[in-house]
């Protein structure tokens, strides 16, 4: 309820925030905010090498001025953590473009699929309340970390790929229900099995090279979402 109240309060003062943003960045600029976990802050590389940072620079280079105004993502965070800690900051940032990439830690922590669906749906709906253009929420699904050297340690008797695929199905269904574009990162992430340069030194997270390849996959969907 705290996050809902925060969003509603900020919605009331939204016109003022929008005016300030327009004054600072120009009316045609994109204010990009991120809701995510370790994959969105570039764990295994640096935040500057994370795919959201790369995406903001790529969009700007392509002619669409983009400012990464908020990325409070944290390693280990679940959808519950994002609702409690990231959503208020997302609302305060007053973005007009956003990406959402969450779910891996829900699965690791044995969150029930129905609970994950409910929390994910809440996140999507609250983010959409903030965005002026509802097609500008881009969803990225969960990569397959089971193919990394350290990934199997998190199985605990479960089949990781199958479990993540099940959560990705939920993500796809909730995105489709709201007419949101979805980038499927799962197949390209499986290249970490055979390409050691795609795995960070921790043996679990993607390397800077991998994040660069992910961004190349995400960029066309982001560019399409930003078209008038």
Model-derived regions, located:
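Positively charged n-region of N-terminal signal peptides that target proteins for export
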Residues: 1-4
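Conserved donor sugar-nucleotide recognition element shared by glycan-biosynthetic enzymes
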Residues: 48, 79, 164
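Alpha-helical cap/lid subdomain in secreted, periplasmic
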Residues: 65, 84-228
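Residue-level signal for threonine
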Residues: 50, 78, 207
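Short, flexible loop segments at the rims of nucleotide/cofactor-binding pockets, characterized by
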Residues: 74-79, 159-160
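Short active-site-adjacent helix-start/loop capping segments
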Residues: 42, 78-81, 106-109
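Serine-esterase "nucleophile elbow" of acetyl-processing enzymes
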Residues: 20-75, 87-94
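Bacterial N-terminal signal peptides
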Residues: 7-16
């Amino acid at each position: 309820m705290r996050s809902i109240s925060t969003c509603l309060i900020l919605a009331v003062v939204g016109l003022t925030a929008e005016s300030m943003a327009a004054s600072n960045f120009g009316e045609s600029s994109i204010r990009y905010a991120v809701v995510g976990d370790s994959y969105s802050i570039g764990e295994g590389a640096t935040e500057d090498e994370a795919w959201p940072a790369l995406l903001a620079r790529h969009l700007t280079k392509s002619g669409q001025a983009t400012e990464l105004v908020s990325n409070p993502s944290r390693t280990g965070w679940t959808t519950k953590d994002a609702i409690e800690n990231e959503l208020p900051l997302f609302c305060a940032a007053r973005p007009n473009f956003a990406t959402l990439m969450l779910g891996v830690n829900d699965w690791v922590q044995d969150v029930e699929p129905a609970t994950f669906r409910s929390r994910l749906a809440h996140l999507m709906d609250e983010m959409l309340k903030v965005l002026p253009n509802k097609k500008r929420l881009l969803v990225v699904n969960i990569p397959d970390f089971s193919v990394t050297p350290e990934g199997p340690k998190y199985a605990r008797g479960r089949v990781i790929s199958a479990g993540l695929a099940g959560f990705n199905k939920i993500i796809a269904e909730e995105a489709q229900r709201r007419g949101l574009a979805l980038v499927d990162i799962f197949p390209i992430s499986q290249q970490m099995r055979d390409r050691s340069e795609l795995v960070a030194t921790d043996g679990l997270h993607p390397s800077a090279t991998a994040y660069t390849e992910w961004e190349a996959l995400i960029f066309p969907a982001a560019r399409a979402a930003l078209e008038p």
